[in-house]
Amino acid sequence: MAATTAAAAVPGVVRAERLLRGGCVVMAATAALLLGFSAETKTVLFVRKTAVAKDVQALWVLTVAAAAAAGYQFAQLVRCMYCSSSGDAGAMAVAWTSFLLDKGCAYVVFASTAAALQACMVGLIGVEALQWSKLCNIYTRFCEQAAAGMLCSFLAAAGMAVLSAFSARRLFRLYSPAGHRRSCPRAAVLATSPH
């Protein structure tokens, strides 16, 4: 009875992982597109200036990190669909690689989002001690697009943190005796044979 409920739970976990990876692809790609293509041109004191993501280094890093994370999550989504249909999801090297890359991806996206948020707060409220003026009063549309991009990347980072928990669960189940028997038919035969 317990084996049938465990077997029935696995497709639900795989389905949840697929949905979450798909959501992370969409959120990270949306963040990269919003940040990468946001630009606004204004004339201030007879000088025409265009605000783009490259003007704030942290926004540019977030744009690149979100684009890379979207590509990685898409590759993992394809791997998840392929491995669940072929039954090769129990490979130890694949589990370790997925675990480490999922963790790294979540950390990089979260850290770059936090850095971009901190840098953009200067543009939002200014710093009078350093005589940095508020820029979001001038470049309103650019700031709104940057805020939407950072919100999408924060949601993607939260989803990636949950996905790293899925990867950790899959990896550490390979080290449990019950999980090892399910993923390795030879071990199941050796465990049931008399010594």
Curated annotation (Swiss-Prot):
Cytoplasmic-side segments: 1-18, 79-106, 167-195
Designated name of the protein: CASP-like protein 2C2
Extracellular side, ranges: 40-57, 128-145
**Subunit composition?**
Homodimer and heterodimers.
Q: Which residues form a coiled coil?
A: none
| Domain of life (superkingdom) | Eukaryota
Sorted alphabetically, the Gene Ontology cellular component annotations on this record are: plasma membrane
- Positions of transmembrane segments: 19-39, 58-78, 107-127, 146-166
Q: Where does the UniProt annotation locate this protein? A: Cell membrane
UniProt keywords, alphabetically:
Cell membrane, Membrane, Transmembrane, Transmembrane helix
Q: How does it sit in the membrane?
A: Multi-pass membrane protein
| Record family assignment | Belongs to the Casparian strip membrane proteins (CASP) family.
Indicate where this protein is primarily found.
membrane
- Which InterPro entries has this protein been placed in? CASP/CASPL, CASP_dom
Biological source species: Oryza sativa subsp. japonica
Q: Does the keyword Transmembrane helix apply?
A: yes
UniProt key word Methyltransferase? no
